[in-house]
Design a protein with these regions (language model features):
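A solvent-exposed interaction/effector surface
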Residues: 1-151
Length: 151
């Protein structure tokens, strides 16, 4: 398997409108919690006939190694909030970003590349990041995830 180096770039990003559910989780529960949260969002959006985009997860540091996450779906034209599903915007501002192709379990390599770039560029991290998941593909090598670190 050929290792493709990550191309890191900076961008100014505007907010993306999401329908999302917030939770506090741990790295060990992360994948299970993301699926559980998205399983709350999608039925509501289908019921409302909302125009949807990609799945997005925003990560913020929590207490004692926990993570505060907002797991949701892009809703460019909005939706009607209900229950725990509420409107959330991705952060706006300058980011370091890269694109990962491969299984989600290998995303740590993309984060390592971004963190190396920030360290060598003397760019401090805010602690907030998010992932935008491309369309599903049964072939893990074709799964695209765009990773953003807020600077």
């Amino acid at each position: 398997v050929a290792v493709v180096p990550y191309e890191v770039r900076t961008e100014l990003t505007g907010p993306r409108k999401l329908a999302a559910v917030r939770a506090v989780t741990t790295p060990q529960r992360l994948s299970t919690d993301i699926i559980r949260l998205l399983d709350q969002v999608w039925p509501l959006l289908r019921e409302q006939g909302a125009r949807t985009g990609h799945n997005v997860v925003i990560y913020r540091p929590g207490e004692g190694g926990e993570l505060v996450i907002d797991a949701g779906v892009e809703v460019p034209e909005g939706f009607t909030a209900r229950g725990e599903v509420r409107p959330v915007d991705t952060p706006a501002g300058e980011v370091a970003t890269t694109t990962h192709y491969g299984d989600y379990s290998e995303l740590s390599a993309a984060y390592a590349a971004l963190e190396r770039w920030c360290a060598t560029s003397s760019r401090p991290l805010s602690g907030t990041s998010w992932e935008v998941y491309g369309d599903w593909d049964d072939d893990p090598a074709r799964r695209r995830t765009d990773v953003y670190l807020l600077l």
